[in-house]
Amino acid sequence: MISGGGPGAMEATHVGAWMAGRSDEETSDALTMLQEAPSFKDKLWLETAFQVMKKYPNPTYISLGIPTWLYGHEPATPFATHIAKYFDNSIREDSILTIAKGGIIYAPGSAGTMQEIFQEAVQNHYLSFGYASPMIFMGKDYWTEEMPVYRLMEHLVAKGKYKNLLMSITDSTEDIVETILEFRSKKTE
């Protein structure tokens, strides 16, 4: 698992990797503990994370967080087992997209997320790595109304400006998992 290595949705990637292989009850307990200080702006955010890590020591699963020095206000997630910091955000984004060959899940975000979307679209269009990987947009209202990038991408595909885009949009985590597993099974056929 790889992410931008920061808080929020990026951190969720690493919490998932940290808890992989554990029971649903243990994962639920860890998430309940983390709800005590859900934002990095909360005074006990880091302490709460360390409590979860102590209660549920990391097994052999690894994850890579790649934060950037550019966003000094966002701390790196403590759940990433490996950290690689970049000075240049565009190189950082390209590195993440190059490594993440199994698909990208786009949670509501800001400028960096927008950059990732269009960089991934170009990589998929040109089949830079020999195939296109799924672009999964999490949050229908956000990606079609508040930040209508999904509609723009659909329009560009319809006009022939982009090819090879495997896009989906959903509010369901189950749909996200199904999309990734389906892609993975087709890739190994």
Residue positions per predicted region:
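Short, solvent-exposed amphipathic alpha-helical segments in soluble enzyme
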Residues: T81, Q119-H125, R151-L156, S185
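Short acidic, glycine/serine/threonine-rich loops at helix termini
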Residues: A12-G16, E116-Q119, M147-Y150
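Conserved thiamine diphosphate
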Residues: Y61, W69-E74, Q115-Y126
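C-terminal functional extensions of proteins
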Residues: I96-T98, Y131-E189
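Gly/Ser/Thr-rich loops at beta-strand to alpha-helix junctions
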Residues: I2-E11, G109-M114
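Acidic/glycine-enriched connector segments
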Residues: G8-Y106
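Short, acidic/small-residue loops that bind anionic groups at enzyme active sites
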Residues: D24-A37, A107-P108, M114, A121-T144
